[in-house]
C-alpha cells in the first residue's frame, strides 16, 4: 500500500464516530465483548497531539488536535482555564483487522510511540507505509504500549 493511499481513509476516519482501542494491563481490547490481546498488528493512518480533561476518572472534555474541544469547536484549548488540568496525549488513528480504531496515549506509551516514530523517520520509513505490532507490558494498574515494525519493506 502506497502511503498516499491512506489519505482518503484519514478523511473518513476524522468524519465518523470512531471506536477507541482500550488499553489494560492484560492487553488491548478492540471491542467491548472481546478478551484482551497481548499484541495486535496495526496500520497507523495518522497521529497527532490530543488533550483530555478528566474528572473523577471520566473524560469531560477532549481535543483530538490539542487546539479545540471536540464537543465545542469554538472552545480553544490555549484559552481554557482548565488547560493545566488536562492530560496531554498522542492520538493514533489505526486500522486493526479492517476496523478503524483510535487510541489515546499518555505519558510512557506516548514517549514510546514518539521515539519509535522518530526512529522510523530517521531511517526514511513512512509510518503509513508499513505494518506495526503494538504490544502491552503489564505495569500492574496500567498497560504500557510498545511499538515495533512488522513489515520492513
Report the location of each language-model feature:
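OB-fold ssDNA-binding interfaces and closely related basic DNA-contact patches used
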Residues: 1-100, 140-142, 146-152
